Amino acid sequence: MEKKSNQNRILSLDLFRGMTVAGMILVNNPGSWSFIYTPLKHAKWNGCTPTDLVFPFFLFVVGTSIPFSVYSKNKIYISKIWFGICIRSITLILIGLFLNFFGEWSFSKLRIPGILQRIGFVYWVVASLYLILPKRMILISWIPILIVHTWVLIQIPPPGESIVYLEPGKDIGAWIDRNVFGENHLWKFSKTWDPEGFFSGISSIATTLLGVFCGSILSSKTNETKKQILSIFGFGILLVLVGLLWDKNLPMNKSLWTGSYVIYTAGLAFLSIGFFEFLNLLLRAKKWNQLKLETIFQPFLVFGKNAILVFVGSGLIARTLNLWTIVLENGKLISIKTFFYSKLNFIGNSHLESFIYAMFNLLFWWIILSVLDKKKIYIKI
């Protein structure tokens, strides 16, 4: 009977996290937002494209890591562990606010919601629950969250409205965002609602709780490796099917973070982690030392080991390249990004040029992260 070591466990999570972060850099840094291949676009409203998997996958792996990081429920250590959880959450939220402030330089129009803000909030809620609730209650707590969120979303119209609208800016979540944060502090491109708003943040807690479920299977010391992998695949298939069926009545929607979206994306996350665990088991069983998982997927693993660094760094550099300008020989003022991107014009295909620019971003960060990995330098919060 083969048991899994923490090293293998961390390896699989780093790989899944790394592929997610690499995907995030690819979709967030096109040469031009006007020329993007369809799979690299978010769904306009309802639906779920490959790009719409990035954020829920990241929240899922946050949950999957909790059973390994928040490992003690001994009353002597709970207060100390919870203090660390609070510090980490506050740090993530503050970094997220700084990223929103960078380049805008305006407190009066500072966007309060954001990706890191949601990660910090959800991590704080889920890790705190993991400390105080019994394990069985933790593993099913995502169910009442989705039930209540769905009921409020489809049954309660915003004040002043007589019926429920699940359209941009017209749902109850958008009303909550406007009244909690104020329109000046929402995403400037949507203005009256925010894709990382408060109400959708509640249902995203369920995504991370499902990640905890997966992490609990992986960290179990009672089951052998094959049974754990079969359990992960089984739950993954079940969740994907339920999500697809639920989509018929409540469409998948990232901005609303609907229940069908939560279930479907969590199912795909289960299947992805199950695949990496199975591949790792297969390679070790056949003793293909030259084909170790670390070697095959090294480009993705380095992204997973320094996820926060690359997320923050890529955001800051992308904003800086748009802010800094240079003067051309004809006197025209353009951003550094536009200057670099224009060097790809010889290709003659706007979509391909935009994609190659994004790939250069990915390559740039892979080189940096590979150097840091060789030196064992990892930025953790």
Predicted regions and their residues:
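Alpha-helical transmembrane segments and their immediate juxtamembrane cytosolic regions
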Residues: 1-381
